């Protein structure tokens, strides 16, 4: 069964780390564009009639007055409110809260795993190249993509602590914790089933460090 997808070429903000994958057949977080309220760094609040989250770099996509899909500059954004959840700017991506304690908590941003995608292209010549290369231009067209041409996704988790976002990973987290919290986190890390990409594990860490 064929599906119509938007072909988008745009500059990708580099991200680090290696995470467990999931699969999607869409380039956006939502199946359709929908209303959102956007809060900007200049203090303005903008009501956007048609908005979405672009999974290539977890950024804001919106339809302008001419009916053209556009990508917003993430550096100008603070928060995006959809009807079901809010996204907050974390470095170069927009991330949603998984769990919170007051104003702190655990946040997640899903992005397309370009390394895995490009490797799949090399291994399977039947897959259509979506041309997700780096460029400063947005190029839109439609493609017929089959069921087998799904895109790999990886989650990036962050802890919000004292107003700052910290990547949820051992080397980033342990160095900022005091001795007792490091001991507790290391104890949790040694338990069977612990993973830095498992939300249940990260929620337990959140309760230790926050």
Give the predicted meaning of each segment.
Residues 23-26, 42, 71-74, 169-172:
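General structural signal for secondary-structure boundaries
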Residues 47-168:
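Aromatic-patch recognition
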Residues 22-39:
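Short N-terminal segments immediately surrounding and downstream of signal-peptide cleavage
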Residues 1-25, 205:
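Bacterial Sec-dependent N-terminal signal peptides
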Residues 142-204, 210:
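A short, solvent-exposed beta-edge/loop patch
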Residues 34-51:
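Glycine-rich, compositionally biased intrinsically disordered regions
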């Amino acid at each position: 069964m064929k599906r119509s997808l938007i072909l988008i070429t745009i500059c990708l903000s580099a991200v680090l780390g290696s995470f467990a994958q999931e699969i999607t057949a869409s380039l956006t977080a939502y199946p359709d564009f929908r209303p959102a309220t956007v809060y900007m760094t200049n203090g303005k609040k903008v009501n956007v009639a048609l908005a979405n989250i672009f999974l290539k770099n977890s950024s804001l996509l919106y339809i302008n007055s001419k009916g053209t899909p556009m990508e917003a500059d993430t550096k100008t954004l603070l928060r995006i409110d959809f009807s079901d959840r809010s996204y907050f700017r974390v470095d170069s991506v927009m991330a949603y809260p998984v769990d919170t304690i007051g104003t702190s908590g655990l946040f997640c941003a899903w992005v397309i795993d370009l390394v895995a995608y490009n490797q799949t292209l090399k291994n399977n010549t039947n897959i259509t190249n979506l041309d997700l290369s780096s460029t400063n231009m947005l190029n839109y067209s439609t493609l017929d993509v089959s069921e087998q041409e799904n895109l790999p996704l990886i989650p990036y988790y962050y802890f919000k602590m004292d107003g700052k976002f910290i990547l949820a990973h051992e080397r980033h987290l342990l160095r900022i914790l005091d001795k007792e919290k490091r001991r507790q986190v290391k104890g949790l890390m040694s338990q069977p089933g612990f993973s830095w990409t498992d939300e249940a594990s990260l929620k337990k860490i959140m309760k230790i460090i926050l």
